[in-house]
């Protein structure tokens, strides 16, 4: 007789306990993420997307391919009567993609706010990239925001995650951005994300910013975004339809209610759309070749849905 317990996150509609699995209806497109590719200049100890200098399972997307989706966002905004969404670029390290500046300028020229997630290390600090960024800032000012990944406010813990010397290089990039008047945010990691521990972490970042002359308000959750750690082995509950009321959480506040991400898989002829930034590889979250195909409900059939979004309360957008 088979006595093994049902596996969690195994059925799109039903949890291991036989309860109805929660889903999130699409509300409106507020952020369109474009994954620039999984190649990165460093390899972090706990990278959720497993980027590295050799990891190219998500290929560089081109400016022409990105433009196709920007065209579609304009059509969707016109049809729905909503404003243009923010365009977010993530990787990998976006500044390794040779079309990064061109894609950012295309989005800005169309009237989008543009957010680029970066480690602010050598790919961003190359002279040509710096010159291009300065030109974009001069032309579009605060419509362009760069969010710098700084895992901890101490060099020791940041470098434990990202490698020796990474803290110093990231601080060089962060200070260059601050000194040149860019709209900035910082993304860090938190072990608990609540209460006294988060207050301590925000105070630590505040001291660092003050010491380095970086004008960021560490108390503002949009200026300093603290993400929960994403432990693949951690025990997490499945999210049922009853959980929204029990937890007093609005499904409309989940990332997948208001955002989608474009990825280009290695060897594929064209990009596809996935539900969110956290799940680029799971086939059940690949929603189609166009934005129009991708706007259905998303079933929360993954541990990241529970830990990172519903329970962690995280969002990747700038707002």
Language-model segment annotations:
Residues 80-88, 114, 140-147, 165-236:
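Conserved C-terminal portion of the radical SAM core fold
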Residues 54-68, 94-140, 146, 150-172, ...:
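Canonical radical SAM enzyme core domain
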Residues 6-90, 95-105, 110-112:
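Conserved alpha-helical substructure of the radical SAM core
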């Amino acid at each position: 007789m088979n006595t093994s317990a049902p596996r969690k996150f195994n059925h799109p509609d039903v949890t291991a306990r036989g309860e109805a699995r929660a889903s999130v209806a699409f509300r409106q497109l507020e952020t369109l993420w474009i994954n620039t590719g999984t190649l990165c200049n460093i390899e972090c100890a706990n990278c959720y997307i497993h980027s590295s200098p050799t990891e190219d399972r998500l290929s560089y997307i081109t400016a022409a391919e990105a433009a196709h989706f920007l065209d579609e966002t304009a059509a969707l905004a016109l049809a729905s009567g909503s404003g243009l969404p923010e365009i977010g670029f993530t990787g990998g390290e976006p500044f390794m993609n040779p079309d990064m500046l061109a894609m950012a300028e295309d989005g800005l020229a169309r009237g989008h706010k543009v957010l680029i997630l970066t480690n602010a290390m050598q790919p961003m600090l190359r002279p040509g990239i710096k010159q291009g960024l300065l030109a974009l800032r001069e032309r579009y000012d605060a419509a362009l925001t760069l969010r710098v990944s700084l895992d901890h406010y101490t060099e020791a813990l940041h470098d434990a995650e990202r490698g020796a010397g990474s803290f110093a290089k990231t601080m060089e990039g962060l200070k260059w951005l601050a000194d040149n008047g860019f709209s900035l945010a910082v993304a860090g990691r938190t072990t608990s994300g609540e209460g006294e521990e988060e207050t301590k972490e925000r105070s630590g970042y505040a001291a660092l910013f003050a010491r380095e002359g970086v004008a960021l308000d560490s108390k503002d959750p949009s200026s300093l975004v603290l993400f929960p750690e994403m432990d693949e082995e951690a025990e997490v509950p499945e999210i049922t339809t009853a959980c929204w009321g029990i937890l007093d959480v609005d499904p409309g506040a989940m990332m997948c209610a208001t955002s989608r991400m474009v990825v280009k898989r290695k060897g594929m002829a064209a990009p596809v759309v996935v539900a969110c930034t956290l799940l680029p590889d799971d086939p059940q979250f690949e929603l189609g070749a166009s934005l129009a195909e991708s706007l259905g409900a998303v079933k929360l059939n993954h541990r990241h849905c529970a830990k990172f979004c519903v329970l962690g309360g995280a969002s990747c957008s700038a707002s």
